[in-house]
Amino acid sequence: GLWSTIKQKGKEAAIAAAKAAGQAVLNSASEAL
């Protein structure tokens, strides 16, 4: 139903945000070295 679609989109968005945050941390860490 609609609710499961919303939950799925939210999960995908959360995963994408976590990946982007992790990439930003890696980038800043490599620049600091």
Curated annotation (Swiss-Prot):
UniProt-listed Pfam families: DD_K (PF12121)
Subcellular location field: Secreted
GO biological process: defense response
Positions where Leucine amide occurs in the chain: 33
GO cellular component, one term: extracellular region
Keywords of the record: Amidation, Amphibian defense peptide, Antimicrobial, Secreted
Tissue: Expressed by the skin glands.
Superkingdom of origin organism: Eukaryota
Biological function: Has antimicrobial activity.
Family membership: Belongs to the frog skin active peptide (FSAP) family. Dermaseptin subfamily.
Protein name: Dermaseptin-H8
Organism whose genome encodes this protein: Pithecopus hypochondrialis
